[in-house]
């Protein structure tokens, strides 16, 4: 029987996401509906971070303590400092730095 390489890749990706989500949860990140949140291997979280459903973290994202990421946000190459609120529907692109106590509202794109 022939192997289905595409199915193998999809299963590998699914399992790697599960490992990353479980690691975040074990470290105290509040992932609401974790199966809908996608992380990069290098995503880092501070303490008391909450992530709502349907958020995608691309490479090189750091999220500081007490931050809140709302649904349908897409974040890559961004440093989020402490007490920051993002989204919903925010698009944070490479090079974005959000300083302490910042708020990025809905349908905002940064670069």
Describe the function of each predicted region.
Residues 30-111:
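Structural signal for interior beta-strand "rungs" in well-ordered beta-sheet cores
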């Amino acid at each position: 029987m022939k192997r289905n390489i595409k199915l193998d890749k999809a299963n590998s990706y699914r399992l790697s996401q599960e490992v990353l989500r479980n690691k975040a949860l074990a470290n105290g990140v509040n992932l609401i509906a974790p199966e809908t949140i996608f992380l990069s291997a290098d995503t880092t979280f501070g303490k008391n971070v909450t992530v709502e459903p349907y958020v995608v973290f691309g490479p090189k994202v750091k999220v500081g303590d007490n931050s809140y990421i709302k649904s349908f946000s897409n974040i890559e190459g961004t440093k989020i400092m402490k007490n920051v609120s993002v989204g919903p529907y925010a698009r944070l692109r490479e090079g974005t730095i959000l300083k302490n106590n910042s708020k990025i509202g809905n349908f905002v794109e940064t670069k």
